[in-house]
Amino acid sequence: MTYELLNTIDAPAELRRLDRRQLGTLADELRAFVLESVAQTGGHLSSNLGTVELTIALHYVFNTPDDRIVWDVGHQSYPHKILTGRREQMATLRQLDGISGFPRRSESPYDTFGTAHSSTSISAALGMALGAKTQGENRVAIAVIGDGAMSAGMAFEAMNNAGVYRNLPLVVVLNDNDMSISPPVGALNRYLARLMSGQFYAATKKGVEKLLSVAPPVLEFAKRFEEHAKGMLVPATMFEEFGFNYIGPIDGHDLESLVPTLQNIRQRALEGGRPQFLHVVTKKGQGYKLAEADPILYHGPGKFNPQEGIKPAARPAKVSYTQVFGQWLCDMAAADKRLVGITPAMREGSGMVEFEQRFPDRYYDVGIAEQHAVTFAGGLACEGLKPVVAIYSTFLQRGYDQLIHDVALQNLPVVFALDRAGLVGADGATHAGAYDMAYLRCIPNMMVMAPADENECRQLLSTAFAQDCPTAVRYPRGAGTGVVVQPTLEPLPVGKAEVRRASTAPAGQRVVILAFGSMVAPAAAAAERLDATVVNMRFVKPLDAACVLEMARTHDYVVTVEEGCVMGGAGSACLEALAAAGVATPVLQLGLPDRFVDHGDHAALLALCGLDANGILASIRERFAVQPRAVQPRVA
C-alpha cells in the first residue's frame, strides 16, 4: 500500500491542516502502516489497530503537544508515535537504540508522560491539568485509559480526587474495547454491561429503535449501540457520581462522530466546570480480520507475514520457564486440594490457561489489581488454603506495602511465582524484573529463591509450596537451558547451595563465582575458561552463609553474579555474611548497573551489562590478577 497522505504528516500541526473529509483516508493508511510495521519488528498490534481513529481525532482536535495527552499503559501508542514524527523510526521499534514500545518523555515532546504499567494516566493528567491551572496556562490534559485499566484502584483514586475540582481542564477518554490483555473481569465491567438494562432504557428502547430505523446511515452504529450502549440513556451513571460530565458511549471508529464530539469537549474543558469524561467503544484489531477474531493472540506478536497471519510455532526444543510453572501448578493442584491460583489479569502471560480450564473453582483472576491480589491471597491463606500468586516481578512492586503488612508481617504461607525476573528484552526498563531480590530479601519471614534452570524451577516451586511462610521463586522470561524437567514434586533442602564446578587452579589464582538463578549458566561458561569454582546459590534468603564462608576461606577471590540490581541484591547478602564473620577475601559484585537498562535483544542487553560469559570473564580479569587457563588442543 502507498502512504500518500500519511507521508505528508510529520507532526500533528500538519494533520490539523487536513480537511475533515481526508481523515478517513488517513486512518486507512495509518492502520495499514501499523500492521506493516509491527509485522516486520514485532510488538503490540491489536490494541494499536483499535485506536487509529481515536488517535487521529485527538491530535486533530487538541493542540498537542501544548494540550497534553497521556496514554495509559502505552500499548496503544504506535499511531500516536507515527503521527508525531517517528514514522521512519518505527523500523527500530523496541530494538537496541531504537524507539520504545511505550511513551517516553525523553523520546518526544508529544510523549508527555512515560507509561507502561497500567492505570496511571488519570493521576498524571490531573496533575498536569492542575499544574496548568495554577500557572495560568490555558491548555487541556487528556487521559486515554482502557476498560481493563479502569479496574485498578489507582484509576478510581484519581477520579475520586479529580471530581472535587471545578473549572479544571481535564478530559478522561475511556477506550472501551472489552479487553485488557486477558478479557477484563470484575464488577466494573459487569456494571458497564448492565447499564443498558435499566428501567429507563427499557422504557425508551422502542422509541430509539424507531428513530434509528428511519436513519439508514446509522444502522450499523445502531447495532453497536445495541451491544455497547452502556449508559447512554441511564441518568446518573457512576462516572457522573464521581463528579465528571459523562458523554457517550460513541463509536470510536467513526471520525464523523469523534471529531465534533471532541471539539465540544475541548471547548467545555477550557470554559470550566466539571472535568469531562468521554466513553468511546472500539474494537481491538479493527481492520485486520485475524486480529479482530483473536485479539489475545495478536496482542504482542513477534514478526509475522500479515497475509498469512501468525502460524502455529513448531514445538520448541526448550520449554519456557512460564510453561514449567504452568505445568507445575496443575500437577501440584492435582496433588493438593488446598492450592488456589491467583493472577492480576495475566492468565496467558503467566501460564495459567490450563490451570483455569482444569480447576476453574480454584482460579482467581482479580483484574489489574496487584495490591488487592496480594492481600486477597493473604485472606485465602488465613482460611487454610495455599495461594499461589502468579505475577510479573515488575508488577509485584505495585503491591509492596501489602506484601509487607498483609502477608509477611502475619507470616502467611503465600507463594509468589515471579515471572519475567531480570531483563526482559524488547519491553525495556518498565517491565524489567531488576529489583525483586533487593526488595524481597529485606522483608522478615520472606524466603526468596532463584532457580538455575527449568528443572530446578519446578523443584523450588515445590520447595516454596511446602513452607509455612511467604515465599518467592523468581525466574526469567523465555526458554530454559534445555535440561530435562523431572515430574517430581519433591522439595529441595531449604537454604542449601550446590557446587556445580570445583576449581583446580593453583594458590593465588583460585576464584569462586557465587551465581544466582539465570546467571549460573554464563558463570559456568566463564569458569571453564578461568578454571574457577561455580556455586549455584539457589537461595537468596535464607542465604547459605556457611557455603559462602567456606568458599571465601578456600579461594583467593570471590565473585557474585546476579541478573538483578547490584545495590542491595543477592551479592550484597553475600558481603553481609562475610562482613559479619570478619572474612576479608576480596569480592567482586556483578549485576545490573545503577541505571535503567533500555529495550533490546535480551542477549545483547546481557552483554551490554557485562553479564554474559565474556563479560563475566573480562570483569574478573580486570579486577583480579588471574589469567584464563590455556585451551587444551583437540585430539584428532
Swiss-Prot record:
The entry lists its GO molecular-function terms as: 1-deoxy-D-xylulose-5-phosphate synthase activity; magnesium ion binding; thiamine pyrophosphate binding
Which pathway does it take part in? Metabolic intermediate biosynthesis; 1-deoxy-D-xylulose 5-phosphate biosynthesis; 1-deoxy-D-xylulose 5-phosphate from D-glyceraldehyde 3-phosphate and pyruvate: step 1/1
Top-rank EC class of the record's enzyme: transferase
The biological process GO terms on file are: 1-deoxy-D-xylulose 5-phosphate biosynthetic process; isopentenyl diphosphate biosynthetic process, methylerythritol 4-phosphate pathway; terpenoid biosynthetic process; thiamine biosynthetic process
Q: Which reaction does it catalyse?
A: D-glyceraldehyde 3-phosphate + pyruvate + H(+) = 1-deoxy-D-xylulose 5-phosphate + CO2
Which residues participate in thiamine diphosphate binding?
A: 75, 116-118, 148-149, 177, 288, 370
Cofactor binding mode, per the note?
Binds 1 Mg(2+) ion per subunit. Binds 1 thiamine pyrophosphate per subunit.
Q: What Gene3D superfamilies does this protein map onto?
A: 3.40.50.920, 3.40.50.970
GO annotations of cellular component type: cytosol
Residues that hold Mg(2+) according to the record: 147, 177
Which EC number(s) does UniProt give?
A: 2.2.1.7
The record ties this protein, via HAMAP family, to: DXP_synth (MF_00315)
Q: How does it assemble?
A: Homodimer.
Q: What does this protein do?
A: Catalyzes the acyloin condensation reaction between C atoms 2 and 3 of pyruvate and glyceraldehyde 3-phosphate to yield 1-deoxy-D-xylulose-5-phosphate (DXP).
Q: Which PANTHER family match?
A: 1-D-DEOXYXYLULOSE 5-PHOSPHATE SYNTHASE-RELATED, 1-DEOXY-D-XYLULOSE-5-PHOSPHATE SYNTHASE, CHLOROPLASTIC
Similarity-based family? Belongs to the transketolase family. DXPS subfamily.
- What name does UniProt use for this protein? 1-deoxy-D-xylulose-5-phosphate synthase
